């Protein structure tokens, strides 16, 4: 099987599964922080995960080394929205820096706006 010359090879991730930094820089609890506690084998959770929040530059360098041309990421709304009317500047800064790093590496960022990562405050109000 061959792929068209313009086929875009990429990789993907989900914020909760890779970012870690679960209580840093203004991130508030999300539904996965609550739902995964005590329900995953060996008590695993996303507190540290792959530590992408702190290691995103290394991760992007690895993607570039692999020849990845596109990267689909998701937004952690608990990192971006600390309350109903409160945007977390540090959360926005993280995603801005990540997108800049991807672009500098020649990797096309593709953002999934919602990948089931709802802040607990929104869940407790019945959702968005």
Predicted segments with their positions:
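N-terminal carbohydrate-binding accessory modules
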Residues: 1-66
């Amino acid at each position: 099987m061959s792929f068209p010359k313009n086929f875009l090879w990429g990789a993907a991730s989900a914020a909760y599964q890779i970012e870690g930094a679960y209580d840093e820089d203004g991130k508030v609890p999300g539904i996965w922080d609550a739902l995964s506690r005590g329900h995953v084998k060996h008590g695993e959770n996303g507190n540290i995960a792959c530590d992408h929040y702190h290691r995103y530059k290394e991760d992007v360098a690895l993607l570039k080394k692999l020849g990845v041309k596109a990267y689909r990421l998701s937004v952690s709304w608990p990192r971006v929205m600390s309350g109903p009317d409160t945007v977390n500047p540090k959360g926005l800064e993280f995603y801005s820096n990540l997108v800049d790093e991807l672009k500098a590496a020649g990797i096309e960022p593709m953002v999934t706006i919602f990948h089931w990562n709802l802040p607990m405050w929104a869940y407790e109000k019945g959702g968005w």
